[in-house]
UniProtKB/Swiss-Prot annotation:
Name of this protein: NAD-dependent malic enzyme, mitochondrial
Active-site positions on this chain: 164, 237
Source organism of this protein record: Ascaris suum
Keywords carried by this UniProt record: Allosteric enzyme, Metal-binding, Mitochondrion, NAD, Oxidoreductase, Transit peptide
Binding site for fumarate: 116, 119, 143
Cofactor: Mg(2+); Mn(2+)
Gene Ontology annotations for the cellular component aspect, listed alphabetically: mitochondrial matrix
EC number: 1.1.1.38
More info: This isoenzyme can also use NADP(+) but is more effective with NAD(+).
Length: 643
Protein backbone atom coordinates (compact mmCIF):
# COMPACT_ATOMS: atom_id res chain seq x y z
CA UNK A 1 0.00 0.00 0.00
CA UNK A 2 2.83 2.42 0.76
CA UNK A 3 4.33 1.82 -2.71
CA UNK A 4 0.96 2.32 -4.41
CA UNK A 5 0.43 5.48 -2.43
CA UNK A 6 3.85 6.71 -3.50
CA UNK A 7 3.11 6.05 -7.20
CA UNK A 8 -0.26 7.78 -6.93
CA UNK A 9 1.43 10.71 -5.26
CA UNK A 10 3.98 10.95 -8.08
CA UNK A 11 1.21 10.84 -10.69
CA UNK A 12 -0.69 13.51 -8.83
CA UNK A 13 2.33 15.80 -8.89
CA UNK A 14 2.69 15.31 -12.64
CA UNK A 15 -0.94 16.21 -13.29
CA UNK A 16 -0.81 19.20 -10.96
CA UNK A 17 2.37 20.76 -12.35
CA UNK A 18 0.58 22.15 -15.42
CA UNK A 19 -2.24 23.71 -13.37
CA UNK A 20 -0.45 25.00 -10.26
CA UNK A 21 3.37 25.04 -9.97
CA UNK A 22 3.15 26.31 -6.35
CA UNK A 23 1.01 23.40 -5.19
CA UNK A 24 3.26 20.95 -7.03
CA UNK A 25 6.31 22.40 -5.30
CA UNK A 26 4.74 21.85 -1.87
CA UNK A 27 3.82 18.27 -2.79
CA UNK A 28 7.40 17.50 -3.85
CA UNK A 29 8.73 18.99 -0.62
CA UNK A 30 6.21 16.93 1.38
CA UNK A 31 7.31 13.77 -0.42
CA UNK A 32 10.96 14.56 0.34
CA UNK A 33 10.27 15.07 4.05
CA UNK A 34 8.19 11.87 4.11
CA UNK A 35 11.09 9.97 2.55
CA UNK A 36 13.47 11.29 5.20
CA UNK A 37 10.92 10.36 7.84
CA UNK A 38 10.53 6.80 6.57
CA UNK A 39 14.31 6.30 6.52
CA UNK A 40 14.43 7.48 10.11
CA UNK A 41 11.68 5.04 11.07
CA UNK A 42 13.48 2.20 9.32
CA UNK A 43 16.62 3.05 11.29
CA UNK A 44 14.56 3.03 14.47
CA UNK A 45 13.23 -0.44 13.74
CA UNK A 46 16.81 -1.67 13.26
CA UNK A 47 18.21 -0.29 16.52
CA UNK A 48 15.13 -1.27 18.50
CA UNK A 49 16.20 -4.91 18.22
CA UNK A 50 19.94 -4.26 18.25
CA UNK A 51 20.60 -6.70 21.10
CA UNK A 52 18.76 -9.62 19.53
CA UNK A 53 20.00 -12.45 17.32
CA UNK A 54 18.50 -12.87 13.83
CA UNK A 55 14.83 -13.88 14.06
CA UNK A 56 12.29 -15.46 11.79
CA UNK A 57 8.86 -13.93 11.19
CA UNK A 58 7.21 -15.64 14.18
CA UNK A 59 10.02 -14.69 16.54
CA UNK A 60 9.96 -11.08 15.38
CA UNK A 61 6.19 -10.99 15.93
CA UNK A 62 6.74 -12.20 19.50
CA UNK A 63 9.41 -9.59 20.06
CA UNK A 64 7.20 -6.78 18.80
CA UNK A 65 4.40 -8.04 21.04
CA UNK A 66 6.63 -7.99 24.12
CA UNK A 67 8.50 -4.71 23.59
CA UNK A 68 7.28 -1.44 25.13
CA UNK A 69 5.41 0.84 22.73
CA UNK A 70 6.55 4.39 22.07
CA UNK A 71 4.27 7.40 21.79
CA UNK A 72 4.97 10.74 20.14
CA UNK A 73 5.75 13.13 23.03
CA UNK A 74 3.29 15.88 23.86
CA UNK A 75 6.07 18.29 24.78
CA UNK A 76 7.44 20.61 22.13
CA UNK A 77 10.16 23.16 21.61
CA UNK A 78 12.23 24.28 24.61
CA UNK A 79 10.13 22.20 27.01
CA UNK A 80 11.16 19.04 25.18
CA UNK A 81 14.85 19.97 25.46
CA UNK A 82 14.41 20.25 29.23
CA UNK A 83 13.18 16.65 29.43
CA UNK A 84 16.26 14.39 29.82
CA UNK A 85 14.28 11.27 28.93
CA UNK A 86 13.50 12.71 25.47
CA UNK A 87 16.37 15.09 24.77
CA UNK A 88 18.91 14.04 22.13
CA UNK A 89 20.78 17.33 21.89
CA UNK A 90 22.37 17.59 18.47
CA UNK A 91 21.19 14.04 17.78
CA UNK A 92 17.77 15.29 16.64
CA UNK A 93 17.24 14.89 12.90
CA UNK A 94 16.23 17.85 10.75
CA UNK A 95 12.74 16.37 10.43
CA UNK A 96 12.41 16.08 14.23
CA UNK A 97 13.70 19.60 14.74
CA UNK A 98 11.15 21.02 12.33
CA UNK A 99 8.22 18.86 13.44
CA UNK A 100 8.85 19.24 17.20
CA UNK A 101 9.58 22.97 17.17
CA UNK A 102 13.30 22.59 17.86
CA UNK A 103 14.65 24.15 14.69
CA UNK A 104 16.81 27.12 15.58
CA UNK A 105 17.01 26.17 19.26
CA UNK A 106 19.95 23.86 18.55
CA UNK A 107 23.22 24.57 16.77
CA UNK A 108 23.04 23.77 13.03
CA UNK A 109 25.12 20.62 13.50
CA UNK A 110 23.93 17.03 13.38
CA UNK A 111 25.74 14.41 15.46
CA UNK A 112 25.20 10.70 15.79
CA UNK A 113 24.94 9.25 19.26
CA UNK A 114 28.34 7.63 18.72
CA UNK A 115 29.87 11.04 18.06
CA UNK A 116 28.19 12.50 21.13
CA UNK A 117 29.38 9.60 23.29
CA UNK A 118 32.94 10.03 22.05
CA UNK A 119 32.76 13.73 22.85
CA UNK A 120 31.55 12.98 26.39
CA UNK A 121 34.15 10.32 27.23
CA UNK A 122 36.93 12.52 25.85
CA UNK A 123 35.90 15.38 28.13
CA UNK A 124 35.51 13.02 31.09
CA UNK A 125 39.08 11.78 30.73
CA UNK A 126 40.32 15.36 30.76
CA UNK A 127 38.84 16.02 34.22
CA UNK A 128 41.36 16.44 37.07
CA UNK A 129 39.86 13.81 39.41
CA UNK A 130 37.09 11.26 39.86
CA UNK A 131 34.80 13.62 41.77
CA UNK A 132 34.92 16.04 38.83
CA UNK A 133 34.03 13.14 36.53
CA UNK A 134 31.12 12.21 38.81
CA UNK A 135 29.81 15.78 38.67
CA UNK A 136 30.09 15.88 34.87
CA UNK A 137 28.27 12.56 34.48
CA UNK A 138 25.63 13.74 36.94
CA UNK A 139 25.02 16.79 34.76
CA UNK A 140 24.80 14.65 31.63
CA UNK A 141 22.15 12.46 33.26
CA UNK A 142 20.15 15.61 33.99
CA UNK A 143 20.30 16.69 30.33
CA UNK A 144 20.31 13.59 28.15
CA UNK A 145 19.39 10.31 29.83
CA UNK A 146 19.97 7.97 26.90
CA UNK A 147 23.39 9.42 26.17
CA UNK A 148 24.35 9.07 29.85
CA UNK A 149 23.48 5.36 29.86
CA UNK A 150 25.03 4.82 26.44
CA UNK A 151 28.36 6.21 27.72
CA UNK A 152 28.20 4.18 30.95
CA UNK A 153 27.32 0.96 29.11
CA UNK A 154 30.05 1.46 26.51
CA UNK A 155 32.70 2.11 29.20
CA UNK A 156 31.34 0.11 32.12
CA UNK A 157 34.71 -0.98 33.53
CA UNK A 158 36.05 2.58 33.42
CA UNK A 159 32.93 4.37 34.66
CA UNK A 160 31.34 2.00 37.17
CA UNK A 161 33.83 3.13 39.85
CA UNK A 162 32.72 6.70 39.08
CA UNK A 163 28.96 6.08 39.02
CA UNK A 164 29.11 3.88 42.12
CA UNK A 165 31.81 2.69 44.53
CA UNK A 166 34.23 4.11 45.38
CA UNK A 167 33.58 7.61 43.93
CA UNK A 168 29.93 7.72 45.00
CA UNK A 169 31.15 7.60 48.59
CA UNK A 170 33.25 10.71 48.03
CA UNK A 171 30.30 12.36 46.31
CA UNK A 172 28.07 11.61 49.31
CA UNK A 173 30.62 13.10 51.70
CA UNK A 174 30.61 16.30 49.64
CA UNK A 175 26.96 16.26 48.65
CA UNK A 176 26.18 19.63 50.18
CA UNK A 177 28.82 21.22 47.94
CA UNK A 178 28.00 19.45 44.67
CA UNK A 179 24.19 19.39 44.95
CA UNK A 180 22.68 20.70 41.70
CA UNK A 181 19.29 19.17 40.99
CA UNK A 182 16.96 16.89 43.00
CA UNK A 183 17.04 13.26 41.83
CA UNK A 184 14.96 11.47 44.43
CA UNK A 185 12.49 11.94 47.26
CA UNK A 186 13.27 13.01 50.81
CA UNK A 187 10.86 11.66 53.43
CA UNK A 188 11.52 12.87 56.96
CA UNK A 189 10.51 11.87 60.45
CA UNK A 190 8.23 14.92 60.35
CA UNK A 191 6.18 13.27 57.57
CA UNK A 192 5.36 10.23 59.69
CA UNK A 193 1.97 9.06 58.45
CA UNK A 194 0.75 7.01 55.50
CA UNK A 195 -1.21 9.92 54.05
CA UNK A 196 1.68 12.39 54.29
CA UNK A 197 4.13 9.96 52.72
CA UNK A 198 1.57 9.13 50.03
CA UNK A 199 1.37 12.84 49.17
CA UNK A 200 5.16 13.03 48.87
CA UNK A 201 5.19 9.96 46.61
CA UNK A 202 2.51 11.65 44.50
CA UNK A 203 4.87 14.57 43.92
CA UNK A 204 7.22 12.28 41.97
CA UNK A 205 6.98 12.92 38.24
CA UNK A 206 6.53 9.26 37.24
CA UNK A 207 3.44 7.20 38.02
CA UNK A 208 4.63 3.76 36.90
CA UNK A 209 7.21 3.18 39.65
CA UNK A 210 8.26 -0.46 39.94
CA UNK A 211 11.60 -0.25 41.79
CA UNK A 212 12.43 1.82 44.88
CA UNK A 213 15.85 1.95 46.52
CA UNK A 214 15.68 3.41 50.02
CA UNK A 215 18.28 4.29 52.67
CA UNK A 216 18.27 6.12 55.98
CA UNK A 217 21.88 7.18 55.43
CA UNK A 218 23.22 5.64 58.65
CA UNK A 219 25.83 3.30 57.19
CA UNK A 220 26.94 4.63 53.82
CA UNK A 221 29.45 2.15 52.38
CA UNK A 222 32.31 2.07 54.91
CA UNK A 223 31.96 5.77 55.68
CA UNK A 224 29.39 5.65 58.45
CA UNK A 225 26.51 8.03 59.15
CA UNK A 226 26.11 10.58 56.33
CA UNK A 227 22.48 11.45 57.00
CA UNK A 228 20.73 13.16 54.09
CA UNK A 229 23.95 13.07 52.07
CA UNK A 230 23.25 9.35 51.63
CA UNK A 231 20.78 10.07 48.80
CA UNK A 232 23.67 9.52 46.40
CA UNK A 233 23.56 5.79 47.16
CA UNK A 234 19.98 5.11 45.95
CA UNK A 235 20.62 7.36 42.94
CA UNK A 236 23.80 5.47 42.02
CA UNK A 237 22.24 2.09 42.72
CA UNK A 238 19.32 2.75 40.39
CA UNK A 239 21.68 4.03 37.70
CA UNK A 240 23.21 0.55 37.80
CA UNK A 241 19.74 -1.02 37.68
CA UNK A 242 19.39 0.68 34.29
CA UNK A 243 22.92 0.43 32.90
CA UNK A 244 23.66 -3.12 34.05
CA UNK A 245 20.20 -4.65 34.33
CA UNK A 246 18.27 -2.87 31.61
CA UNK A 247 15.53 -1.73 34.01
CA UNK A 248 13.58 1.18 32.50
CA UNK A 249 14.62 4.51 34.14
CA UNK A 250 11.00 5.62 34.42
CA UNK A 251 10.36 2.68 36.77
CA UNK A 252 13.01 3.79 39.29
CA UNK A 253 12.61 5.92 42.43
CA UNK A 254 15.47 6.79 44.87
CA UNK A 255 14.35 7.61 48.43
CA UNK A 256 16.15 9.02 51.48
CA UNK A 257 14.49 8.60 54.87
CA UNK A 258 15.79 11.50 56.96
CA UNK A 259 15.50 10.82 60.69
CA UNK A 260 18.47 13.02 61.59
CA UNK A 261 22.17 12.18 61.92
CA UNK A 262 24.61 11.47 64.73
CA UNK A 263 27.50 12.79 62.65
CA UNK A 264 28.53 15.95 64.50
CA UNK A 265 30.65 17.16 61.57
CA UNK A 266 27.50 17.26 59.44
CA UNK A 267 25.38 18.86 62.13
CA UNK A 268 27.96 21.64 62.37
CA UNK A 269 28.37 21.95 58.59
CA UNK A 270 26.59 25.08 57.28
CA UNK A 271 26.12 23.36 53.90
CA UNK A 272 24.43 20.24 55.33
CA UNK A 273 21.06 19.75 53.61
CA UNK A 274 19.31 17.40 56.06
CA UNK A 275 17.50 17.62 59.39
CA UNK A 276 19.78 19.13 62.02
CA UNK A 277 19.23 16.88 65.02
CA UNK A 278 20.32 13.52 66.38
CA UNK A 279 18.81 10.37 64.93
CA UNK A 280 15.34 9.40 66.00
CA UNK A 281 15.16 5.77 67.08
CA UNK A 282 12.74 3.38 68.69
CA UNK A 283 8.99 3.42 68.15
CA UNK A 284 8.88 6.58 66.01
CA UNK A 285 11.57 5.20 63.68
CA UNK A 286 9.76 1.88 63.29
CA UNK A 287 6.48 3.67 62.67
CA UNK A 288 8.09 5.71 59.89
CA UNK A 289 9.33 2.53 58.20
CA UNK A 290 5.92 0.87 58.54
CA UNK A 291 4.16 3.91 57.12
CA UNK A 292 6.66 4.15 54.27
CA UNK A 293 6.11 0.54 53.22
CA UNK A 294 2.32 0.93 53.44
CA UNK A 295 2.34 4.18 51.47
CA UNK A 296 4.54 2.70 48.71
CA UNK A 297 2.27 -0.28 48.19
CA UNK A 298 -0.84 1.92 48.41
CA UNK A 299 0.55 4.26 45.75
CA UNK A 300 2.30 1.82 43.41
CA UNK A 301 0.91 -1.62 44.28
CA UNK A 302 2.14 -4.72 46.07
CA UNK A 303 4.28 -5.75 43.10
CA UNK A 304 6.64 -2.76 43.53
CA UNK A 305 10.15 -3.85 44.49
CA UNK A 306 11.65 -2.04 47.50
CA UNK A 307 15.39 -2.49 48.02
CA UNK A 308 16.86 -1.53 51.39
CA UNK A 309 20.36 -0.08 51.15
CA UNK A 310 23.01 0.96 53.71
CA UNK A 311 20.96 0.66 56.87
CA UNK A 312 23.04 0.22 60.04
CA UNK A 313 23.63 -3.33 61.24
CA UNK A 314 21.13 -3.24 64.15
CA UNK A 315 18.34 -2.36 61.70
CA UNK A 316 19.41 -4.22 58.55
CA UNK A 317 18.56 -7.81 59.57
CA UNK A 318 15.68 -6.72 61.79
CA UNK A 319 13.91 -4.91 58.98
CA UNK A 320 14.66 -7.69 56.48
CA UNK A 321 13.11 -10.26 58.82
CA UNK A 322 10.14 -7.97 59.46
CA UNK A 323 9.23 -7.17 55.85
CA UNK A 324 10.61 -9.99 53.71
CA UNK A 325 7.46 -12.14 53.78
CA UNK A 326 5.03 -9.20 53.65
CA UNK A 327 6.41 -7.12 50.78
CA UNK A 328 8.40 -7.47 47.58
CA UNK A 329 11.74 -6.40 49.04
CA UNK A 330 15.35 -7.37 49.66
CA UNK A 331 18.43 -5.97 51.36
CA UNK A 332 21.35 -5.81 48.97
CA UNK A 333 23.94 -5.37 51.75
CA UNK A 334 22.86 -8.72 53.18
CA UNK A 335 21.45 -10.83 50.36
CA UNK A 336 23.21 -9.24 47.38
CA UNK A 337 26.62 -9.27 49.07
CA UNK A 338 26.11 -12.84 50.24
CA UNK A 339 25.10 -13.95 46.77
CA UNK A 340 28.06 -12.40 44.97
CA UNK A 341 30.56 -13.82 47.49
CA UNK A 342 29.06 -17.28 47.19
CA UNK A 343 29.38 -16.86 43.41
CA UNK A 344 33.11 -16.18 43.88
CA UNK A 345 33.48 -19.18 46.18
CA UNK A 346 31.68 -21.40 43.66
CA UNK A 347 34.17 -20.24 41.03
CA UNK A 348 37.06 -21.05 43.39
CA UNK A 349 35.85 -24.66 43.67
CA UNK A 350 36.86 -25.13 40.03
CA UNK A 351 40.46 -24.41 41.06
CA UNK A 352 40.62 -25.99 44.53
CA UNK A 353 38.64 -29.06 43.39
CA UNK A 354 36.71 -28.92 46.67
CA UNK A 355 33.01 -28.39 47.25
CA UNK A 356 31.91 -25.33 49.21
CA UNK A 357 30.94 -27.73 52.01
CA UNK A 358 34.48 -29.14 52.17
CA UNK A 359 36.13 -25.82 53.10
CA UNK A 360 36.28 -23.88 56.36
CA UNK A 361 35.64 -20.12 56.37
CA UNK A 362 37.02 -17.43 58.69
CA UNK A 363 35.24 -14.06 58.65
CA UNK A 364 37.04 -11.00 59.97
CA UNK A 365 34.19 -8.61 60.68
CA UNK A 366 30.83 -9.97 61.78
CA UNK A 367 28.39 -7.29 60.70
CA UNK A 368 25.34 -7.64 58.50
CA UNK A 369 27.39 -8.39 55.37
CA UNK A 370 29.51 -11.15 56.94
CA UNK A 371 26.54 -12.71 58.72
CA UNK A 372 24.54 -12.70 55.51
CA UNK A 373 27.41 -14.32 53.60
CA UNK A 374 27.82 -16.97 56.29
CA UNK A 375 24.12 -17.83 56.19
CA UNK A 376 24.16 -18.04 52.39
CA UNK A 377 27.19 -20.36 52.55
CA UNK A 378 25.27 -22.55 55.01
CA UNK A 379 22.36 -22.61 52.54
CA UNK A 380 24.71 -23.77 49.75
CA UNK A 381 26.34 -26.38 52.01
CA UNK A 382 22.92 -27.80 52.84
CA UNK A 383 22.19 -28.04 49.12
CA UNK A 384 25.40 -30.07 48.83
CA UNK A 385 24.09 -32.58 51.36
CA UNK A 386 25.36 -31.71 54.84
CA UNK A 387 23.27 -30.69 57.83
CA UNK A 388 22.85 -27.11 59.01
CA UNK A 389 24.76 -27.90 62.21
CA UNK A 390 27.70 -29.35 60.27
CA UNK A 391 27.69 -26.32 57.97
CA UNK A 392 27.71 -23.84 60.86
CA UNK A 393 30.61 -25.71 62.45
CA UNK A 394 32.73 -24.90 59.38
CA UNK A 395 32.28 -21.14 59.76
CA UNK A 396 34.20 -18.91 62.19
CA UNK A 397 33.32 -15.29 62.96
CA UNK A 398 35.57 -12.58 64.41
CA UNK A 399 34.25 -9.16 65.40
CA UNK A 400 35.64 -6.19 67.31
CA UNK A 401 35.84 -8.35 70.46
CA UNK A 402 37.61 -11.24 68.74
CA UNK A 403 36.48 -14.77 67.93
CA UNK A 404 32.78 -15.38 68.54
CA UNK A 405 32.77 -18.14 71.17
CA UNK A 406 30.20 -19.80 73.39
CA UNK A 407 31.80 -18.13 76.42
CA UNK A 408 30.38 -14.70 75.54
CA UNK A 409 27.81 -13.25 77.89
CA UNK A 410 26.15 -11.14 75.19
CA UNK A 411 25.89 -12.14 71.56
CA UNK A 412 24.02 -11.20 68.40
CA UNK A 413 21.23 -13.81 68.13
CA UNK A 414 22.30 -14.60 64.55
CA UNK A 415 25.84 -15.37 65.74
CA UNK A 416 24.79 -18.05 68.21
CA UNK A 417 24.74 -20.76 65.55
CA UNK A 418 28.36 -19.96 64.63
CA UNK A 419 29.77 -19.61 68.17
CA UNK A 420 32.68 -21.96 68.82
CA UNK A 421 33.74 -23.88 71.90
CA UNK A 422 37.26 -22.42 71.73
CA UNK A 423 39.41 -20.07 73.82
CA UNK A 424 38.66 -16.39 73.33
CA UNK A 425 41.22 -14.51 71.22
CA UNK A 426 41.53 -11.32 69.20
CA UNK A 427 44.38 -12.69 67.05
CA UNK A 428 43.59 -13.64 63.45
CA UNK A 429 46.78 -15.69 63.35
CA UNK A 430 45.76 -17.81 66.33
CA UNK A 431 42.39 -18.58 64.78
CA UNK A 432 43.97 -19.45 61.42
CA UNK A 433 46.39 -21.88 63.06
CA UNK A 434 43.67 -23.46 65.19
CA UNK A 435 40.84 -23.66 62.65
CA UNK A 436 42.92 -24.06 59.46
CA UNK A 437 40.39 -22.32 57.15
CA UNK A 438 40.56 -22.55 53.38
CA UNK A 439 39.04 -19.10 52.95
CA UNK A 440 39.68 -15.80 54.74
CA UNK A 441 36.93 -13.22 54.20
CA UNK A 442 37.29 -9.62 55.36
CA UNK A 443 34.40 -7.21 55.88
CA UNK A 444 35.79 -5.16 58.75
CA UNK A 445 36.82 -1.84 57.11
CA UNK A 446 40.17 -2.27 58.92
CA UNK A 447 42.95 -1.42 56.47
CA UNK A 448 45.89 -3.81 56.72
CA UNK A 449 44.13 -6.38 58.90
CA UNK A 450 45.41 -9.08 56.54
CA UNK A 451 49.11 -8.34 56.94
CA UNK A 452 52.03 -10.31 55.55
CA UNK A 453 52.09 -12.74 58.47
CA UNK A 454 48.37 -13.50 58.17
CA UNK A 455 48.51 -14.00 54.39
CA UNK A 456 51.59 -16.24 54.60
CA UNK A 457 49.88 -18.32 57.29
CA UNK A 458 46.98 -18.93 54.90
CA UNK A 459 49.43 -20.00 52.19
CA UNK A 460 51.16 -22.44 54.55
CA UNK A 461 47.99 -24.47 55.10
CA UNK A 462 46.41 -24.13 51.64
CA UNK A 463 47.82 -24.79 48.19
CA UNK A 464 45.42 -22.16 46.79
CA UNK A 465 44.27 -19.94 49.69
CA UNK A 466 41.05 -17.98 49.16
CA UNK A 467 41.46 -14.37 50.32
CA UNK A 468 38.54 -11.99 49.87
CA UNK A 469 39.13 -8.40 51.12
CA UNK A 470 35.67 -6.95 50.69
CA UNK A 471 35.66 -3.67 52.62
CA UNK A 472 34.87 -0.47 50.70
CA UNK A 473 36.35 1.87 49.66
CA UNK A 474 39.85 0.68 48.67
CA UNK A 475 41.39 2.72 51.50
CA UNK A 476 39.63 0.40 53.98
CA UNK A 477 40.39 -2.94 52.28
CA UNK A 478 41.96 -5.57 54.57
CA UNK A 479 44.73 -6.10 52.01
CA UNK A 480 45.51 -5.14 48.43
CA UNK A 481 45.68 -7.49 45.48
CA UNK A 482 49.42 -6.88 45.27
CA UNK A 483 49.90 -7.95 48.89
CA UNK A 484 47.78 -11.09 48.49
CA UNK A 485 49.62 -12.24 45.36
CA UNK A 486 53.09 -11.26 46.59
CA UNK A 487 52.87 -12.97 50.00
CA UNK A 488 51.45 -16.19 48.49
CA UNK A 489 53.77 -16.17 45.46
CA UNK A 490 50.77 -15.87 43.16
CA UNK A 491 48.79 -18.74 44.69
CA UNK A 492 45.99 -16.67 46.22
CA UNK A 493 42.47 -16.72 44.83
CA UNK A 494 41.77 -13.05 45.50
CA UNK A 495 38.74 -10.80 45.26
CA UNK A 496 38.04 -7.34 46.62
CA UNK A 497 35.04 -5.11 47.25
CA UNK A 498 36.45 -2.19 45.24
CA UNK A 499 38.58 -2.45 42.09
CA UNK A 500 42.34 -2.90 42.21
CA UNK A 501 44.67 -2.56 39.21
CA UNK A 502 46.28 -5.49 37.42
CA UNK A 503 49.49 -6.74 39.01
CA UNK A 504 52.50 -8.47 37.47
CA UNK A 505 54.52 -11.03 39.46
CA UNK A 506 57.26 -13.30 38.13
CA UNK A 507 56.30 -12.50 34.55
CA UNK A 508 52.63 -13.37 35.08
CA UNK A 509 49.86 -10.77 34.98
CA UNK A 510 47.10 -11.07 37.56
CA UNK A 511 43.73 -9.41 37.02
CA UNK A 512 41.98 -9.40 40.40
CA UNK A 513 38.22 -9.83 40.45
CA UNK A 514 35.89 -7.46 42.21
CA UNK A 515 33.18 -9.05 44.35
CA UNK A 516 30.76 -6.37 43.34
CA UNK A 517 27.06 -6.72 44.13
CA UNK A 518 26.45 -5.33 40.64
CA UNK A 519 26.85 -8.88 39.32
CA UNK A 520 23.73 -9.81 41.27
CA UNK A 521 21.25 -7.08 42.14
CA UNK A 522 20.52 -5.71 38.62
CA UNK A 523 19.52 -9.16 37.37
CA UNK A 524 17.55 -10.00 40.50
CA UNK A 525 15.75 -6.65 40.27
CA UNK A 526 15.04 -7.13 36.55
CA UNK A 527 13.58 -10.60 37.06
CA UNK A 528 11.53 -9.52 40.07
CA UNK A 529 10.05 -6.52 38.26
CA UNK A 530 9.32 -8.16 34.91
CA UNK A 531 7.73 -11.32 36.29
CA UNK A 532 6.10 -9.72 39.35
CA UNK A 533 7.80 -12.06 41.80
CA UNK A 534 6.18 -11.43 45.17
CA UNK A 535 8.92 -12.54 47.60
CA UNK A 536 12.66 -12.36 46.89
CA UNK A 537 14.10 -15.14 49.05
CA UNK A 538 17.57 -16.64 49.45
CA UNK A 539 16.83 -19.40 46.93
CA UNK A 540 16.66 -16.75 44.20
CA UNK A 541 19.92 -15.16 45.32
CA UNK A 542 21.63 -18.56 45.35
CA UNK A 543 20.29 -19.20 41.86
CA UNK A 544 21.79 -15.87 40.76
CA UNK A 545 25.14 -16.79 42.37
CA UNK A 546 25.31 -20.03 40.43
CA UNK A 547 24.54 -18.24 37.17
CA UNK A 548 27.31 -15.67 37.78
CA UNK A 549 29.84 -18.40 38.64
CA UNK A 550 28.96 -20.33 35.48
CA UNK A 551 29.84 -17.26 33.39
CA UNK A 552 33.51 -17.17 34.49
CA UNK A 553 35.67 -18.46 31.63
CA UNK A 554 38.80 -20.59 31.91
CA UNK A 555 40.81 -17.69 30.48
CA UNK A 556 39.60 -15.52 33.36
CA UNK A 557 40.62 -18.15 35.90
CA UNK A 558 44.12 -18.30 34.43
CA UNK A 559 44.69 -14.62 35.26
CA UNK A 560 43.21 -14.93 38.74
CA UNK A 561 39.78 -13.47 37.99
CA UNK A 562 37.04 -15.29 39.93
CA UNK A 563 34.25 -13.13 38.52
CA UNK A 564 33.17 -12.48 34.91
CA UNK A 565 34.42 -9.37 33.16
CA UNK A 566 32.43 -6.26 34.00
CA UNK A 567 31.46 -5.73 30.37
CA UNK A 568 29.43 -8.95 30.56
CA UNK A 569 27.20 -7.86 33.44
CA UNK A 570 24.22 -6.75 31.35
CA UNK A 571 24.05 -10.08 29.55
CA UNK A 572 24.45 -11.90 32.88
CA UNK A 573 21.57 -9.84 34.30
CA UNK A 574 19.33 -10.96 31.44
CA UNK A 575 20.28 -14.59 32.07
CA UNK A 576 19.61 -14.24 35.81
CA UNK A 577 16.16 -12.79 35.07
CA UNK A 578 15.36 -15.69 32.73
CA UNK A 579 16.50 -18.29 35.29
CA UNK A 580 14.42 -16.58 37.97
CA UNK A 581 11.37 -16.71 35.71
CA UNK A 582 11.80 -20.43 35.03
CA UNK A 583 12.21 -21.17 38.72
CA UNK A 584 9.31 -18.99 39.87
CA UNK A 585 6.82 -20.16 37.25
CA UNK A 586 7.70 -23.74 38.19
CA UNK A 587 7.10 -22.96 41.88
CA UNK A 588 4.05 -20.76 41.35
CA UNK A 589 5.63 -17.56 42.67
CA UNK A 590 5.69 -15.53 39.43
CA UNK A 591 2.58 -13.37 39.02
CA UNK A 592 2.86 -12.14 35.42
CA UNK A 593 0.03 -13.76 33.46
CA UNK A 594 -0.27 -15.06 30.91
CA UNK A 595 3.22 -16.52 31.06
CA UNK A 596 5.24 -15.27 28.07
CA UNK A 597 5.64 -17.93 25.40
CA UNK A 598 9.39 -17.25 25.20
CA UNK A 599 10.85 -16.01 28.51
CA UNK A 600 14.20 -14.88 27.12
CA UNK A 601 12.66 -12.94 24.25
CA UNK A 602 10.28 -11.30 26.69
CA UNK A 603 13.18 -10.14 28.87
CA UNK A 604 15.24 -8.90 25.92
CA UNK A 605 12.26 -7.01 24.54
CA UNK A 606 11.67 -5.27 27.88
CA UNK A 607 15.23 -4.15 28.70
CA UNK A 608 16.12 -0.50 28.32
CA UNK A 609 17.53 0.48 24.94
CA UNK A 610 20.29 3.10 25.19
CA UNK A 611 20.08 3.91 21.47
CA UNK A 612 18.19 7.00 20.37
CA UNK A 613 14.69 6.24 19.16
CA UNK A 614 12.49 8.01 16.65
CA UNK A 615 10.28 10.30 18.73
CA UNK A 616 7.58 10.69 16.09
CA UNK A 617 5.39 7.69 15.41
CA UNK A 618 5.41 6.25 11.91
CA UNK A 619 2.52 7.24 9.67
CA UNK A 620 0.50 4.60 7.84
CA UNK A 621 -2.21 4.42 5.17
CA UNK A 622 -5.93 3.72 5.39
CA UNK A 623 -7.96 2.12 2.59
CA UNK A 624 -8.76 4.84 0.05
CA UNK A 625 -12.51 4.25 0.25
CA UNK A 626 -12.46 5.05 3.99
CA UNK A 627 -10.98 8.45 3.31
CA UNK A 628 -13.60 9.64 0.80
CA UNK A 629 -16.34 12.11 1.61
CA UNK A 630 -19.72 10.62 2.38
CA UNK A 631 -21.53 12.44 -0.41
CA UNK A 632 -20.69 14.02 -3.78
CA UNK A 633 -20.36 17.79 -3.88
CA UNK A 634 -23.01 19.25 -6.24
CA UNK A 635 -21.74 21.24 -9.18
CA UNK A 636 -23.01 24.82 -9.02
CA UNK A 637 -22.99 26.66 -12.35
CA UNK A 638 -21.80 30.23 -12.16
CA UNK A 639 -24.48 31.45 -14.58
CA UNK A 640 -27.21 30.02 -12.33
CA UNK A 641 -26.10 32.42 -9.63
CA UNK A 642 -26.71 35.48 -11.78
CA UNK A 643 -29.55 37.65 -10.52
Amino acid sequence: PRVRSFIAHQSGITSVIRRSPDIAHRMVRSLSVSSQRNKSVAHHEDVYSHNLPPMDEKEMALYKLYRPERVTPKKRSAELLKEPRLNKGMGFSLYERQYLGLHGLLPPAFMTQEQQAYRVITKLREQPNDLARYIQLDGLQDRNEKLFYRVVCDHVKELMPIVYTPTVGLACQNFGYIYRKPKGLYITINDNSVSKIYQILSNWHEEDVRAIVVTDGERILGLGDLGAYGIGIPVGKLALYVALGGVQPKWCLPVLLDVGTNNMDLLNDPFYIGLRHKRVRGKDYDTLLDNFMKACTKKYGQKTLIQFEDFANPNAFRLLDKYQDKYTMFNDDIQGTASVIVAGLLTCTRVTKKLVSQEKYLFFGAGAASTGIAEMIVHQMQNEGISKEEACNRIYLMDIDGLVTKNRKEMNPRHVQFAKDMPETTSILEVIRAARPGALIGASTVRGAFNEEVIRAMAEINERPIIFALSNPTSKAECTAEEAYTFTNGAALYASGSPFPNFELNGHTYKPGQGNNAYIFPGVALGTILFQIRHVDNDLFLLAAKKVASCVTEDSLKVGRVYPQLKEIREISIQIAVEMAKYCYKNGTANLYPQPEDLEKYVRAQVYNTEYEELINATYDWPEQDMRHGFPVPVVRHDSMDG
